[in-house]
Amino acid sequence: MRGFVYVLVCVLALASFSRAQLPGAGGPVLPGGGPTIGPVNPDPTRTEVCAKFWVQEGNSCYLFDSGAFLRQVAASRPVVVNNQDGLFQAAANMYCGQMHPNASLVTVNSLEENNFLYEWAVRMMIEPEPVWIGLHAGPTGQWQWYSGEPVTYTNWERMTPPIAEPGLGAMIFDADIIAQMFNNQVEITPQWVPEQAINDRHALICEYHPSGMTAAAAAPTNAPTFPPMTTAPPMAATTRGPVMFQNNPRNLVNSLTGGRFGGSLLHEIPRRQRMRPSNYRKNPYFGIQP
């Protein structure tokens, strides 16, 4: 019995020691997982307008972040990624405030700003990555920005804006496989998609306005809030087979060597969260297309 008590005391002491090594130990833990990260200290010698790791565009500074916290379990252990899937939306907004005192999840005020974020972030992606923006369902049943700025511009994927149901937030860079002439084309859309803000973890874009700068006002326009469609040049008619989806890549490997899918490539398909069963959201899916 004494041996059991001794082991239990040692385990508790080790757990307490390990907890003390975490960055921000003793502080609140973000809902998306990972330890609290302290605010960024301003560098008085820095001559750039934006803080380190941030990029300036217009009157704003932006930070694209995976939301993957680095965590050291103990002083003698290496630093590991604690939350590789990103953060819940509210936790992502808290994280932005820790990266800079005046920052929040990005507020998108115009089509030009939306297009900049799209081109800037997608160029850094190896694979499509859904990203939280600051629009979320407020307590009054209306869409609102975490920055507190008025909602003067939206860019929803569907023509009819979604209802601001409790618990919803907006993400950008949704992706899905599309039928194209060439194999395995993946479309990353600059339109916004409603997501469960407390159930889905994503990367994030933060924004703040440097001292003396304010948010650029959206120019009044009656044009649609999505990029115009471009017309592809005429192409010869061709027969295109269907996309084949499976949640186990081994079931698809044999299809790559012959038949209609011969010569195709196998890709993991980004998981669009809405209107999909829970088992689809939790497990990766794979697809091939001739």
Curated annotation (Swiss-Prot):
SMART domains: CLECT
Keyword tags: Glycoprotein, Signal
Glycosylation sites: 102
GO molecular function (one): carbohydrate binding
TM annotation in the entry: none
Gene Ontology BP term (one): immune response
Superkingdom classification of source: Eukaryota
C-type lectin domain boundaries: 92-162
Tissue-by-tissue expression: Accumulates exclusively in mineralized tissues.
GO CC field: external side of plasma membrane
Signal peptide start and end residues: 1-15
InterPro entries, sorted: C-type_lectin-like, C-type_lectin-like/link_sf, CTDL_fold, DC-SIGN_domain-containing
Function as written in the Swiss-Prot or TrEMBL entry: Matrix protein of the sea urchin embryo spicule. The function of the matrix proteins is to direct crystal growth in certain orientations and inhibit growth in others.
PANTHER family: C-TYPE LECTIN SUPERFAMILY MEMBER, CHONDROITIN SULFATE PROTEOGLYCAN 2 ISOFORM X1
The protein's name: 30 kDa spicule matrix protein
